[in-house]
């Protein structure tokens, strides 16, 4: 009986760690997506070409 209780506890522990890691991954990827989608700000007279500021003309 004691071994069965230990196995059930370890299964609950693994599920808990899995859910926590999924939650952390979702939060981190959401933050990275916000950073990636931020618009580039170039000085006046410059345009964005392939993610870099270039002189317009």
Curated annotation (Swiss-Prot):
Residues 1-29 form the signal peptide. The modification Alanine amide is found at residue 56. Disulfide bonds join 42-53. The keyword Glycoprotein applies. This is U17-myrmicitoxin-Tb1a. O-glycosylated. Expressed by the venom gland.
């Amino acid at each position: 009986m004691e071994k069965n209780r230990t196995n059930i506890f370890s299964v609950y522990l693994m599920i808990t760690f899995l859910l926590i890691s999924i939650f952390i991954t979702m939060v981190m990827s959401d933050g990275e997506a916000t950073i990636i989608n931020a618009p580039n700000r170039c000085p006046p007279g410059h345009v964005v070409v392939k993610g870099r500021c270039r002189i317009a003309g």
